[in-house]
Curated annotation (Swiss-Prot):
K(+) binds at D129. The gene is coaX. Belongs to the type III pantothenate kinase family. HAMAP family: Pantothen_kinase_3. Pathway: Cofactor biosynthesis; coenzyme A biosynthesis; CoA from (R)-pantothenate: step 1/5. Its cofactor is NH4(+); K(+). This is Type III pantothenate kinase. GO terms for cellular component: cytoplasm. Pfam families: Pan_kinase. It is found in: Cytoplasm. It comes from Clostridioides difficile (strain 630) (Peptoclostridium difficile). Its EC number is 2.7.1.33. The keyword Glycoprotein does not apply. Homodimer.
Amino acid sequence: MLLVFDVGNTNMVLGIYKGDKLVNYWRIKTDREKTSDEYGILISNLFDYDNVNISDIDDVIISSVVPNVMHSLENFCIKYCKKQPLIVGPGIKTGLNIKYDNPKQVGADRIVNAVAGIEKYGAPSILVDFGTATTFCAISEKGEYLGGTIAPGIKISSEALFQSASKLPRVELAKPGMTICKSTVSAMQSGIIYGYVGLVDKIISIMKKELNCDDVKVIATGGLAKLIASETKSIDYVDGFLTLEGLRIIYEKNQE
């Protein structure tokens, strides 16, 4: 079995693959202070709950945008899984032609999403990942990673409103009913969601013009992808496991 880690700024997602099938997954909080043993206890408990034997893990691959967590996770893999993990970064085979000015600056999550997007949906395409930051990545007709845009995530935007406006409460991110709202909470939800939908549609519209290609597919992933995609005009597919799939594909490329 293959254990994959997608480590984001807020959460990390773990998945287990048997061949090309995702058989288990878990979402936990990314904690920069946790030691390898603390992660070992937490992950072992998750495995036990779902009857997963840690000794059945054959290999591990990690994608992380949080450098401070890598040491603990790598030590967890060595101590508890008895495996040296494959880490997405410079020198790893991805099969991706990156056209960035400095390819080393491209986040591991964006590379992994691009690999999965091309494999599953083809090119040209735009990949949107709704995480702590929302990333938009453009893939050319030739399957090249051209670059993209990074915007503040919707939760960051909502939290900034709460933190900066003393009389406004923290609100749940929920689908609004209308824009002419009758309460402060619904007014904030409407402004946050519809405002963010406008941001997404506008960036995708401009990116499509810059790609100058026919039939550009737009694929969204991330925790809030379904909520935003249901309101946009521009997202074609929502794939909640795009990053995990990309990790599996990259792992397989590095076994060839």
